[in-house]
Amino acid sequence: MPHLAELVAKAKAAVEDAQDIAALDLVRVEYLGKKGHLTLQMTSLRELPAEERPAAGAVINQAKQEVQEALNARKEKLESAVLNARLAAETIDVSLPGRRMENGGLHPVTRTIERIETFFGELGFSVESGPEIEDDYHNFDALNIPAHHPARADHDTFWFDATRLLRTQTSGVQIRTMQEQQPPIRIIVPGRVYRNDYDQTHTPMFHQMEGLIVDRDISFTNLKGTLHDFLRNFFEEDLQIRFRPSYFPFTEPSAEVDVMGKNGKWLEVLGCGMVHPNVLRNVGIDPEIYSGFAFGMGMERLTMLRYGVTDLRAFFENDLRFLKQFK
């Protein structure tokens, strides 16, 4: 095989001349492919005497190995050049500012709840909570709402069975607190409540905040002063406020509180009243010694008034375009 060395030299030269991976692959096929020059050298072994074939075969295999090693080395070099060129084209300017981190924000209803908790916390109120799956005693009976009261109607309340329901108000926590604590009591109760209603100003689930004070010599004047201070603090302006006589089964006397809107119309914001003597008796508190006041307000409604939102359902639709306005 006098020309084997010449084939190897030509193959190595062709390898070095290849300028990209595609050209290099053509060289591989030309010399090491199924019909390549070096591969065909193996067919010449049958022309040799049997005793010479092993040595000749070893020489051919050595030649093929040299060419393969040259191919591997050239391929690595070409791939490295491609990578370096790409990295050079994608050079990062480390002096540029990094991407701005996108900060989250509190939901507007959560902002309202925390704002109210802060205000009443400074007045000495503690925050209480209770079960959302309630029994009819704590949700109705103990609050002076008898079985025939309209609030127990199926269209207002989500009932599980004859005695269990999704609470329609957080007032049940007031009952539980008065059963467990002796006066003086001063609490607020934020939480989710459920009513079977859905339109532009109502949703089946919404957030409510109850407030309760029970102590000696608590009067309606205390109630009015507390709510005046709260509303002016919450809306951050000297609002015109009025108390309208109303009816709630668990307070007597009862009132609804309105604020004057920017359009010159009165807007209802909450309900309140003096704790009904029957409610105090139901929890073992003597109404001849103690009195108290209670108030309740919808968090979504207050949030709508504070931020000028017109559709309650926007708070529950998870539209980031809407929510990012409150960050």
Curated annotation (Swiss-Prot):
Q: Which residues bind Mg(2+)?
A: E252
Catalysis performed (reactions): tRNA(Phe) + L-phenylalanine + ATP = L-phenylalanyl-tRNA(Phe) + AMP + diphosphate + H(+)
- Cofactor: binding details: Binds 2 magnesium ions per tetramer.
Q: Which InterPro entries match?
A: aa-tRNA-synth_II, aa-tRNA-synth_II/BPL/LPL, Phe-tRNA-synth_IIc_asu, Phe-tRNA_ligase_II_N, Phe_tRNA_ligase_alpha1_bac, Phenylalanyl-tRNA_Synthase, tRNA-bd_arm
Cofactor needs = Mg(2+)
Q: Which Gene3D superfamilies match?
A: Bira Bifunctional Protein, Domain 2
Q: Which SUPFAM superfamilies match?
A: Class II aaRS and biotin synthetases, tRNA-binding arm
Q: Which domain of life is it from?
A: Bacteria
Q: Which family does it belong to?
A: Belongs to the class-II aminoacyl-tRNA synthetase family. Phe-tRNA synthetase alpha subunit type 1 subfamily.
Q: Which NCBIfam families match?
A: pheS
Subunit architecture: Tetramer of two alpha and two beta subunits.
For this entry, the protein name equals Phenylalanine--tRNA ligase alpha subunit
- Tell me the name of the encoding gene: pheS
